[in-house]
Amino acid sequence: MGLDALVPLAVTVAIFVLLVDLMHRRQRWAARYPPGPMPLPGLGNLLHVDFQNTPNSFNQLRRRFGDVFSLQLAWTPVVVLNGLEAVREALVTRGEDTADRPPVPITEMLGFGPHSQGLFLARYGPAWREQRRFSVSTLRNLGLGKKSLEQWVTEEATYLCAAFADHAGRPFRPNGLLDKAVSNVIASLTCRRRFEYNDPCLLRLLDLTMEGLKEESGLLREVLNAIPVLLRIPGLAGKVLRSQKAFLAQLDELLTEHRMTWDPAQPPRDLTEAFLAEMEKTKGNPESSFNDENLHLVVADLFSAGMVTTSITLAWGLLLMILHPDVQRRVQQEIDDVIGRVRRPEMGDQTYMPYTTAVIHEVQRFADIVPLGVTHMTSRDIEVQGFLIPKGTTLFTNLSSVLKDEANWEKPFRFHPEHFLDAQGRFVKPEAFLPFSAGRRACLGEPLARMELFLFFTCLLQRFSFSVPAGQPRPSPHGVFAFLVTPSPYELCAVPR
Protein backbone atom coordinates (compact mmCIF):
# COMPACT_ATOMS: atom_id res chain seq x y z
CA MET A 1 0.00 0.00 0.00
CA GLY A 2 1.51 3.33 -1.05
CA LEU A 3 1.84 6.44 1.05
CA ASP A 4 -0.91 8.19 -0.93
CA ALA A 5 -3.36 5.45 0.01
CA LEU A 6 -2.42 5.57 3.70
CA VAL A 7 -3.26 9.25 4.11
CA PRO A 8 -7.04 8.88 3.45
CA LEU A 9 -7.11 5.81 5.72
CA ALA A 10 -5.41 7.72 8.53
CA VAL A 11 -7.81 10.64 8.12
CA THR A 12 -10.80 8.27 8.18
CA VAL A 13 -9.55 6.56 11.36
CA ALA A 14 -8.89 9.93 13.01
CA ILE A 15 -12.40 11.17 12.16
CA PHE A 16 -13.90 7.93 13.49
CA VAL A 17 -11.98 8.22 16.77
CA LEU A 18 -13.02 11.86 17.17
CA LEU A 19 -16.69 11.02 16.52
CA VAL A 20 -16.62 8.21 19.08
CA ASP A 21 -14.87 10.52 21.52
CA LEU A 22 -17.48 13.24 21.02
CA MET A 23 -20.23 10.69 21.57
CA HIS A 24 -18.71 9.74 24.93
CA ARG A 25 -18.29 13.39 25.92
CA ARG A 26 -21.96 14.25 25.57
CA GLN A 27 -22.77 13.58 29.22
CA ARG A 28 -20.14 16.13 30.29
CA TRP A 29 -22.33 18.78 28.71
CA ALA A 30 -25.38 17.68 30.72
CA ALA A 31 -26.64 19.92 33.48
CA ARG A 32 -25.24 19.14 36.95
CA TYR A 33 -22.71 16.57 35.73
CA PRO A 34 -19.68 16.66 38.09
CA PRO A 35 -16.83 18.95 36.99
CA GLY A 36 -13.41 17.62 36.06
CA PRO A 37 -10.33 18.17 33.90
CA MET A 38 -10.87 18.37 30.14
CA PRO A 39 -10.23 14.93 28.59
CA LEU A 40 -7.93 14.48 25.61
CA PRO A 41 -9.34 12.91 22.42
CA GLY A 42 -9.13 9.11 22.63
CA LEU A 43 -7.07 9.06 25.84
CA GLY A 44 -9.48 10.97 28.03
CA ASN A 45 -7.83 11.77 31.36
CA LEU A 46 -5.44 8.80 31.42
CA LEU A 47 -2.50 11.20 31.41
CA HIS A 48 -4.00 13.40 34.15
CA VAL A 49 -3.74 10.63 36.76
CA ASP A 50 -0.52 9.18 38.17
CA PHE A 51 -1.55 5.53 38.51
CA GLN A 52 1.61 4.82 40.50
CA ASN A 53 0.15 7.08 43.20
CA THR A 54 -3.54 7.38 42.38
CA PRO A 55 -4.66 8.61 45.84
CA ASN A 56 -2.33 11.61 45.61
CA SER A 57 -3.64 12.47 42.12
CA PHE A 58 -7.23 12.25 43.33
CA ASN A 59 -6.50 14.45 46.35
CA GLN A 60 -4.98 17.11 44.09
CA LEU A 61 -7.99 16.99 41.77
CA ARG A 62 -10.31 17.21 44.78
CA ARG A 63 -8.70 20.48 45.84
CA ARG A 64 -9.34 21.81 42.34
CA PHE A 65 -12.82 20.45 41.56
CA GLY A 66 -14.44 19.59 44.91
CA ASP A 67 -15.70 16.45 46.64
CA VAL A 68 -17.42 15.04 43.54
CA PHE A 69 -15.50 15.28 40.28
CA SER A 70 -15.46 13.43 36.97
CA LEU A 71 -12.82 11.82 34.79
CA GLN A 72 -12.84 10.01 31.49
CA LEU A 73 -10.41 7.08 31.24
CA ALA A 74 -10.21 6.63 27.47
CA TRP A 75 -13.97 6.31 26.85
CA THR A 76 -14.94 5.09 30.32
CA PRO A 77 -16.85 7.70 32.39
CA VAL A 78 -15.62 7.89 35.98
CA VAL A 79 -16.77 9.87 39.01
CA VAL A 80 -14.57 10.15 42.10
CA LEU A 81 -16.29 10.58 45.47
CA ASN A 82 -14.44 12.31 48.30
CA GLY A 83 -15.34 13.06 51.91
CA LEU A 84 -17.69 11.31 54.32
CA GLU A 85 -20.92 12.87 53.08
CA ALA A 86 -20.43 12.02 49.39
CA VAL A 87 -19.14 8.50 50.07
CA ARG A 88 -21.90 7.71 52.55
CA GLU A 89 -24.63 9.11 50.31
CA ALA A 90 -23.45 7.00 47.37
CA LEU A 91 -22.68 3.72 49.16
CA VAL A 92 -25.31 3.73 51.91
CA THR A 93 -28.20 6.01 50.97
CA ARG A 94 -28.03 4.93 47.31
CA GLY A 95 -26.52 1.54 48.11
CA GLU A 96 -28.80 -0.50 45.86
CA ASP A 97 -27.94 1.71 42.89
CA THR A 98 -24.15 1.70 43.45
CA ALA A 99 -23.54 -1.94 44.42
CA ASP A 100 -22.53 -3.06 40.93
CA ARG A 101 -18.94 -3.46 39.76
CA PRO A 102 -17.67 -2.15 36.42
CA PRO A 103 -16.57 -4.73 33.83
CA VAL A 104 -12.87 -5.58 34.11
CA PRO A 105 -12.02 -7.06 30.70
CA ILE A 106 -8.57 -8.33 31.63
CA THR A 107 -10.04 -10.65 34.30
CA GLU A 108 -11.36 -12.88 31.51
CA MET A 109 -7.80 -14.22 31.37
CA LEU A 110 -8.23 -15.43 34.96
CA GLY A 111 -11.29 -17.52 34.12
CA PHE A 112 -13.99 -14.93 34.84
CA GLY A 113 -17.30 -15.63 33.13
CA PRO A 114 -21.04 -15.01 33.57
CA HIS A 115 -21.30 -17.59 36.39
CA SER A 116 -17.72 -17.50 37.68
CA GLN A 117 -16.80 -14.05 38.97
CA GLY A 118 -15.59 -14.77 42.48
CA LEU A 119 -16.75 -12.38 45.19
CA PHE A 120 -15.04 -9.01 45.13
CA LEU A 121 -15.21 -8.16 41.42
CA ALA A 122 -18.50 -9.96 40.75
CA ARG A 123 -21.28 -7.98 39.09
CA TYR A 124 -24.19 -7.14 41.39
CA GLY A 125 -26.76 -9.80 40.65
CA PRO A 126 -27.96 -13.33 41.50
CA ALA A 127 -24.48 -14.93 41.30
CA TRP A 128 -22.96 -12.39 43.68
CA ARG A 129 -25.88 -12.62 46.12
CA GLU A 130 -25.63 -16.42 46.07
CA GLN A 131 -21.91 -16.37 46.82
CA ARG A 132 -22.14 -13.59 49.42
CA ARG A 133 -24.84 -15.48 51.35
CA PHE A 134 -22.91 -18.72 51.05
CA SER A 135 -19.61 -17.22 52.24
CA VAL A 136 -21.12 -15.37 55.20
CA SER A 137 -23.18 -18.35 56.41
CA THR A 138 -20.32 -20.83 55.86
CA LEU A 139 -17.78 -18.72 57.72
CA ARG A 140 -20.26 -18.38 60.57
CA ASN A 141 -20.82 -22.15 60.63
CA LEU A 142 -17.05 -22.67 60.72
CA GLY A 143 -16.75 -20.61 63.88
CA LEU A 144 -16.57 -16.94 62.91
CA GLY A 145 -17.59 -14.99 65.98
CA LYS A 146 -17.36 -18.11 68.14
CA LYS A 147 -14.85 -19.50 70.61
CA SER A 148 -13.70 -22.26 68.24
CA LEU A 149 -12.20 -19.89 65.66
CA GLU A 150 -10.87 -17.62 68.39
CA GLN A 151 -8.91 -20.55 69.80
CA TRP A 152 -7.52 -21.30 66.32
CA VAL A 153 -6.29 -17.70 65.96
CA THR A 154 -4.82 -17.71 69.47
CA GLU A 155 -3.01 -20.98 68.75
CA GLU A 156 -1.54 -19.48 65.57
CA ALA A 157 -0.48 -16.43 67.56
CA THR A 158 1.53 -18.79 69.78
CA TYR A 159 3.39 -20.11 66.71
CA LEU A 160 3.96 -16.52 65.56
CA CYS A 161 5.41 -15.49 68.92
CA ALA A 162 7.71 -18.51 68.86
CA ALA A 163 8.98 -17.48 65.42
CA PHE A 164 9.61 -13.94 66.70
CA ALA A 165 11.47 -15.37 69.70
CA ASP A 166 13.76 -17.34 67.37
CA HIS A 167 15.35 -14.04 66.33
CA ALA A 168 16.60 -13.64 69.91
CA GLY A 169 16.32 -9.86 69.91
CA ARG A 170 18.29 -9.46 66.68
CA PRO A 171 16.99 -7.15 63.90
CA PHE A 172 14.57 -8.68 61.38
CA ARG A 173 11.72 -7.76 59.08
CA PRO A 174 8.39 -8.93 60.57
CA ASN A 175 6.31 -8.84 57.37
CA GLY A 176 7.01 -12.40 56.22
CA LEU A 177 6.11 -13.98 59.57
CA LEU A 178 2.93 -11.92 59.81
CA ASP A 179 1.96 -13.04 56.29
CA LYS A 180 2.42 -16.69 57.25
CA ALA A 181 0.45 -16.47 60.48
CA VAL A 182 -2.54 -14.71 58.94
CA SER A 183 -2.44 -17.04 55.91
CA ASN A 184 -2.76 -20.04 58.20
CA VAL A 185 -5.99 -18.65 59.65
CA ILE A 186 -7.43 -18.27 56.14
CA ALA A 187 -6.09 -21.70 55.11
CA SER A 188 -7.81 -23.26 58.10
CA LEU A 189 -11.14 -21.79 57.01
CA THR A 190 -10.82 -22.51 53.30
CA CYS A 191 -9.10 -25.92 53.25
CA ARG A 192 -8.66 -27.00 56.89
CA ARG A 193 -4.91 -26.85 56.68
CA ARG A 194 -2.07 -25.32 58.64
CA PHE A 195 1.27 -24.76 56.90
CA GLU A 196 4.64 -24.82 58.58
CA TYR A 197 6.27 -21.42 58.12
CA ASN A 198 8.91 -22.90 55.81
CA ASP A 199 6.45 -24.88 53.66
CA PRO A 200 7.35 -24.33 49.95
CA CYS A 201 3.67 -24.24 48.95
CA LEU A 202 2.92 -21.46 51.44
CA LEU A 203 6.01 -19.50 50.45
CA ARG A 204 5.05 -19.75 46.78
CA LEU A 205 1.46 -18.61 47.46
CA LEU A 206 2.67 -15.63 49.47
CA ASP A 207 5.21 -14.56 46.85
CA LEU A 208 2.60 -14.74 44.09
CA THR A 209 0.04 -12.89 46.21
CA MET A 210 2.37 -9.94 46.75
CA GLU A 211 3.43 -9.90 43.09
CA GLY A 212 -0.23 -10.06 42.07
CA LEU A 213 -0.94 -6.97 44.15
CA LYS A 214 1.49 -4.99 42.02
CA GLU A 215 -0.55 -5.99 38.95
CA GLU A 216 -3.61 -4.26 40.44
CA SER A 217 -2.21 -0.79 39.81
CA GLY A 218 -0.42 1.04 37.03
CA LEU A 219 -1.19 2.73 33.73
CA LEU A 220 -1.07 -0.45 31.59
CA ARG A 221 -3.88 -2.09 33.56
CA GLU A 222 -6.10 0.98 33.26
CA VAL A 223 -5.42 1.35 29.53
CA LEU A 224 -6.22 -2.33 28.83
CA ASN A 225 -9.46 -2.16 30.81
CA ALA A 226 -10.45 1.09 29.10
CA ILE A 227 -9.45 -0.14 25.61
CA PRO A 228 -9.78 -3.97 25.81
CA VAL A 229 -9.30 -4.37 22.06
CA LEU A 230 -5.58 -3.90 22.77
CA LEU A 231 -5.57 -7.36 24.37
CA ARG A 232 -5.75 -8.76 20.83
CA ILE A 233 -2.22 -7.56 20.13
CA PRO A 234 -0.19 -10.77 19.65
CA GLY A 235 1.76 -11.71 22.76
CA LEU A 236 0.33 -8.98 25.01
CA ALA A 237 -2.36 -11.08 26.68
CA GLY A 238 0.23 -13.59 27.84
CA LYS A 239 2.18 -10.87 29.65
CA VAL A 240 -0.78 -9.51 31.63
CA LEU A 241 -1.58 -10.75 35.18
CA ARG A 242 1.17 -13.36 35.09
CA SER A 243 1.46 -13.58 38.88
CA GLN A 244 -2.29 -13.83 39.40
CA LYS A 245 -2.49 -16.64 36.84
CA ALA A 246 0.36 -18.46 38.58
CA PHE A 247 -1.35 -17.95 41.95
CA LEU A 248 -4.55 -19.57 40.66
CA ALA A 249 -2.53 -22.46 39.23
CA GLN A 250 -0.81 -23.00 42.60
CA LEU A 251 -4.15 -22.77 44.39
CA ASP A 252 -5.61 -25.30 41.94
CA GLU A 253 -2.99 -27.84 43.03
CA LEU A 254 -3.89 -27.25 46.67
CA LEU A 255 -7.63 -27.59 46.06
CA THR A 256 -7.20 -30.70 43.90
CA GLU A 257 -5.21 -32.33 46.69
CA HIS A 258 -7.81 -31.34 49.27
CA ARG A 259 -10.68 -32.54 47.09
CA MET A 260 -9.27 -36.09 47.20
CA THR A 261 -9.82 -36.18 50.98
CA TRP A 262 -13.40 -34.87 50.87
CA ASP A 263 -16.11 -37.20 52.15
CA PRO A 264 -19.54 -35.99 50.92
CA ALA A 265 -21.23 -38.07 53.61
CA GLN A 266 -19.62 -35.98 56.37
CA PRO A 267 -20.45 -32.39 57.36
CA PRO A 268 -18.18 -29.84 55.63
CA ARG A 269 -14.99 -29.14 57.55
CA ASP A 270 -14.10 -25.98 55.63
CA LEU A 271 -15.33 -23.58 52.96
CA THR A 272 -14.00 -25.68 50.08
CA GLU A 273 -15.94 -28.74 51.21
CA ALA A 274 -19.07 -26.62 51.75
CA PHE A 275 -18.67 -25.28 48.20
CA LEU A 276 -18.24 -28.81 46.80
CA ALA A 277 -21.42 -29.86 48.62
CA GLU A 278 -23.32 -27.00 46.98
CA MET A 279 -21.90 -28.04 43.60
CA GLU A 280 -23.40 -31.49 44.12
CA LYS A 281 -26.79 -29.99 45.00
CA THR A 282 -26.86 -27.73 41.93
CA LYS A 283 -25.36 -30.21 39.48
CA GLY A 284 -27.10 -29.89 36.12
CA ASN A 285 -28.10 -26.25 36.70
CA PRO A 286 -26.15 -24.16 34.14
CA GLU A 287 -27.17 -20.92 35.90
CA SER A 288 -25.57 -21.90 39.21
CA SER A 289 -22.49 -20.03 40.42
CA PHE A 290 -21.32 -23.19 42.18
CA ASN A 291 -18.87 -24.57 39.63
CA ASP A 292 -15.19 -25.50 39.43
CA GLU A 293 -14.09 -22.17 37.97
CA ASN A 294 -15.85 -20.16 40.66
CA LEU A 295 -14.53 -22.38 43.45
CA HIS A 296 -11.00 -21.28 42.57
CA LEU A 297 -11.97 -17.61 42.29
CA VAL A 298 -13.95 -17.50 45.56
CA VAL A 299 -11.19 -19.22 47.53
CA ALA A 300 -8.58 -17.00 45.85
CA ASP A 301 -10.55 -13.88 46.81
CA LEU A 302 -10.87 -14.97 50.43
CA PHE A 303 -7.26 -16.09 50.70
CA SER A 304 -5.60 -13.09 49.08
CA ALA A 305 -7.85 -10.37 50.49
CA GLY A 306 -8.11 -11.98 53.93
CA MET A 307 -4.38 -12.49 54.23
CA VAL A 308 -2.97 -9.33 52.72
CA THR A 309 -5.10 -6.67 54.40
CA THR A 310 -4.77 -8.05 57.94
CA SER A 311 -1.06 -8.82 57.60
CA ILE A 312 -0.26 -5.37 56.23
CA THR A 313 -2.26 -3.73 59.03
CA LEU A 314 -0.30 -5.71 61.64
CA ALA A 315 2.96 -4.68 59.94
CA TRP A 316 1.83 -1.06 60.23
CA GLY A 317 0.91 -1.68 63.87
CA LEU A 318 4.39 -2.88 64.80
CA LEU A 319 6.01 -0.06 62.82
CA LEU A 320 3.94 2.52 64.68
CA MET A 321 4.82 0.90 68.02
CA ILE A 322 8.56 1.32 67.42
CA LEU A 323 7.98 4.88 66.20
CA HIS A 324 5.83 5.69 69.26
CA PRO A 325 7.32 3.81 72.25
CA ASP A 326 5.16 5.80 74.68
CA VAL A 327 2.04 4.36 73.03
CA GLN A 328 3.59 0.88 73.10
CA ARG A 329 4.28 1.11 76.83
CA ARG A 330 0.74 2.25 77.57
CA VAL A 331 -0.72 -0.66 75.56
CA GLN A 332 1.52 -3.10 77.43
CA GLN A 333 0.47 -1.65 80.77
CA GLU A 334 -3.19 -2.19 79.87
CA ILE A 335 -2.41 -5.76 78.75
CA ASP A 336 -0.63 -6.41 82.08
CA ASP A 337 -3.52 -4.95 84.07
CA VAL A 338 -6.32 -6.83 82.28
CA ILE A 339 -4.71 -10.07 81.03
CA GLY A 340 -1.37 -10.39 82.77
CA ARG A 341 1.70 -11.93 81.18
CA VAL A 342 0.72 -15.62 81.37
CA ARG A 343 -2.87 -16.08 80.20
CA ARG A 344 -3.55 -15.86 76.47
CA PRO A 345 -5.61 -12.87 75.31
CA GLU A 346 -9.29 -13.49 74.53
CA MET A 347 -11.84 -11.47 72.60
CA GLY A 348 -13.75 -10.95 75.84
CA ASP A 349 -10.82 -8.88 77.12
CA GLN A 350 -11.37 -6.22 74.47
CA THR A 351 -14.27 -4.66 76.37
CA TYR A 352 -11.92 -3.85 79.24
CA MET A 353 -9.09 -2.55 77.05
CA PRO A 354 -10.26 0.77 75.56
CA TYR A 355 -6.77 2.14 74.92
CA THR A 356 -5.52 -0.96 73.09
CA THR A 357 -8.72 -1.01 71.05
CA ALA A 358 -8.26 2.68 70.22
CA VAL A 359 -4.66 2.05 69.14
CA ILE A 360 -5.67 -0.77 66.79
CA HIS A 361 -8.36 1.41 65.22
CA GLU A 362 -5.92 4.31 64.88
CA VAL A 363 -3.43 1.99 63.17
CA GLN A 364 -6.15 1.17 60.63
CA ARG A 365 -7.05 4.83 60.14
CA PHE A 366 -3.49 6.13 59.89
CA ALA A 367 -2.23 3.26 57.68
CA ASP A 368 -5.18 3.70 55.32
CA ILE A 369 -4.14 0.56 53.44
CA VAL A 370 -7.03 0.47 50.93
CA PRO A 371 -7.22 4.18 50.07
CA LEU A 372 -9.55 3.83 47.07
CA GLY A 373 -11.53 0.76 48.08
CA VAL A 374 -12.86 -1.30 45.18
CA THR A 375 -14.57 0.42 42.26
CA HIS A 376 -18.37 0.55 42.07
CA MET A 377 -20.70 1.26 39.14
CA THR A 378 -24.10 2.91 39.00
CA SER A 379 -26.95 0.67 37.87
CA ARG A 380 -29.28 3.65 37.28
CA ASP A 381 -29.10 7.45 37.13
CA ILE A 382 -28.47 8.81 40.63
CA GLU A 383 -27.88 12.12 42.38
CA VAL A 384 -25.01 12.60 44.84
CA GLN A 385 -24.34 15.91 46.59
CA GLY A 386 -26.54 17.63 44.02
CA PHE A 387 -24.69 16.21 41.00
CA LEU A 388 -26.31 13.88 38.47
CA ILE A 389 -24.36 10.67 37.80
CA PRO A 390 -25.64 8.61 34.84
CA LYS A 391 -26.22 4.87 34.81
CA GLY A 392 -23.10 2.87 33.93
CA THR A 393 -20.63 5.32 35.50
CA THR A 394 -17.62 3.87 37.31
CA LEU A 395 -17.29 5.18 40.87
CA PHE A 396 -14.04 5.55 42.80
CA THR A 397 -14.59 6.03 46.54
CA ASN A 398 -11.63 7.92 47.97
CA LEU A 399 -11.68 6.33 51.44
CA SER A 400 -8.42 8.11 52.22
CA SER A 401 -10.28 11.42 51.99
CA VAL A 402 -12.64 10.13 54.71
CA LEU A 403 -10.04 8.61 57.02
CA LYS A 404 -7.83 11.70 56.84
CA ASP A 405 -10.36 14.50 56.53
CA GLU A 406 -9.58 17.52 58.69
CA ALA A 407 -13.32 18.03 59.16
CA ASN A 408 -13.64 14.72 61.03
CA TRP A 409 -10.30 14.12 62.73
CA GLU A 410 -8.39 16.34 65.16
CA LYS A 411 -4.97 15.36 63.80
CA PRO A 412 -5.68 13.55 60.52
CA PHE A 413 -2.07 13.17 59.37
CA ARG A 414 -0.61 12.13 62.72
CA PHE A 415 -0.81 8.86 64.65
CA HIS A 416 -3.13 9.85 67.48
CA PRO A 417 -5.02 7.05 69.34
CA GLU A 418 -7.06 9.67 71.20
CA HIS A 419 -9.16 9.97 68.02
CA PHE A 420 -10.99 6.92 69.39
CA LEU A 421 -11.26 7.90 73.07
CA ASP A 422 -13.71 10.26 74.75
CA ALA A 423 -12.87 12.63 77.60
CA GLN A 424 -13.34 9.79 80.11
CA GLY A 425 -10.98 7.45 78.25
CA ARG A 426 -13.76 5.26 76.89
CA PHE A 427 -13.52 3.82 73.39
CA VAL A 428 -15.61 5.57 70.73
CA LYS A 429 -15.77 4.93 67.00
CA PRO A 430 -16.44 8.03 64.85
CA GLU A 431 -18.71 7.53 61.85
CA ALA A 432 -15.85 8.61 59.56
CA PHE A 433 -14.01 5.36 60.38
CA LEU A 434 -14.55 3.44 57.12
CA PRO A 435 -11.48 1.24 56.47
CA PHE A 436 -13.75 -1.62 55.35
CA SER A 437 -15.83 0.65 53.08
CA ALA A 438 -19.62 0.74 53.57
CA GLY A 439 -22.90 -0.35 52.06
CA ARG A 440 -23.84 -3.60 50.36
CA ARG A 441 -20.31 -4.33 49.13
CA ALA A 442 -18.56 -3.65 52.45
CA CYS A 443 -15.85 -6.18 53.33
CA LEU A 444 -17.49 -9.46 54.39
CA GLY A 445 -14.35 -10.44 56.30
CA GLU A 446 -14.56 -7.50 58.71
CA PRO A 447 -15.49 -9.63 61.78
CA LEU A 448 -12.58 -12.00 61.12
CA ALA A 449 -10.16 -9.11 60.57
CA ARG A 450 -11.21 -7.46 63.85
CA MET A 451 -10.61 -10.72 65.72
CA GLU A 452 -7.21 -11.32 64.13
CA LEU A 453 -6.01 -7.76 64.67
CA PHE A 454 -6.89 -7.79 68.36
CA LEU A 455 -5.58 -11.27 69.17
CA PHE A 456 -2.35 -11.13 67.15
CA PHE A 457 -1.55 -7.56 68.24
CA THR A 458 -2.15 -8.16 71.96
CA CYS A 459 -0.31 -11.51 71.93
CA LEU A 460 2.76 -9.87 70.39
CA LEU A 461 2.73 -6.86 72.72
CA GLN A 462 2.18 -9.17 75.70
CA ARG A 463 5.29 -11.21 74.88
CA PHE A 464 7.68 -8.64 73.40
CA SER A 465 8.86 -5.06 73.52
CA PHE A 466 9.64 -3.73 70.05
CA SER A 467 12.28 -1.16 69.15
CA VAL A 468 14.28 0.34 66.29
CA PRO A 469 17.54 -1.63 65.94
CA ALA A 470 20.56 0.16 67.41
CA GLY A 471 22.49 2.12 64.83
CA GLN A 472 19.69 2.09 62.27
CA PRO A 473 17.84 5.26 61.19
CA ARG A 474 14.30 5.86 62.30
CA PRO A 475 11.97 4.07 59.80
CA SER A 476 9.74 6.12 57.54
CA PRO A 477 6.09 6.51 58.58
CA HIS A 478 5.11 6.90 54.92
CA GLY A 479 3.72 3.99 52.94
CA VAL A 480 4.18 2.66 49.42
CA PHE A 481 1.12 2.55 47.13
CA ALA A 482 0.48 -0.47 44.90
CA PHE A 483 -3.33 -0.74 45.08
CA LEU A 484 -2.76 -1.30 48.81
CA VAL A 485 -0.50 0.90 50.93
CA THR A 486 2.29 -1.08 52.59
CA PRO A 487 4.86 0.25 55.07
CA SER A 488 8.24 1.18 53.67
CA PRO A 489 10.63 -1.72 54.40
CA TYR A 490 11.84 -1.69 58.01
CA GLU A 491 13.49 -3.88 60.62
CA LEU A 492 12.77 -4.13 64.33
CA CYS A 493 14.05 -5.90 67.41
CA ALA A 494 11.63 -8.06 69.43
CA VAL A 495 12.92 -8.38 73.00
CA PRO A 496 11.06 -10.80 75.31
CA ARG A 497 9.40 -9.05 78.24
UniProtKB/Swiss-Prot annotation:
SUPFAM superfamilies xref list: Cytochrome P450 (SSF48264)
Claim: Membrane is one of the keywords in the record: yes
Cofactor section: heme
Description of what induces expression: P450 can be induced to high levels in liver and other tissues by various foreign compounds, including drugs, pesticides, and carcinogens.
Top-rank taxon, per record: Eukaryota
Principal subcellular localization: endoplasmic reticulum
Binding, heme: 443
Reactions that this protein is recorded to catalyse: an organic molecule + reduced [NADPH--hemoprotein reductase] + O2 = an alcohol + oxidized [NADPH--hemoprotein reductase] + H2O + H(+)
Topology in membrane: Peripheral membrane protein
Keywords, sorted A to Z: Endoplasmic reticulum, Heme, Iron, Membrane, Metal-binding, Microsome, Monooxygenase, Oxidoreductase
Enzyme Commission numbers on file: 1.14.14.1
Protein's UniProt keywords contain Heme: yes
GO molecular function list: heme binding; iron ion binding; oxidoreductase activity, acting on paired donors, with incorporation or reduction of molecular oxygen, reduced flavin or flavoprotein as one donor, and incorporation of one atom of oxygen
Location relative to the cell: Endoplasmic reticulum membrane; Microsome membrane
GO CC terms in record: endoplasmic reticulum membrane
Classification via Pfam families: p450
UniProt feature coiled coil, ranges: none
BP-aspect Gene Ontology terms: arachidonate metabolic process; xenobiotic metabolic process
Family membership: Belongs to the cytochrome P450 family.
Job description of the protein: Responsible for the metabolism of many drugs and environmental chemicals that it oxidizes.
Protein name: Cytochrome P450 2D19
Lineage: Eukaryota, Metazoa, Chordata, Craniata, Vertebrata
The gene coding this protein: CYP2D19
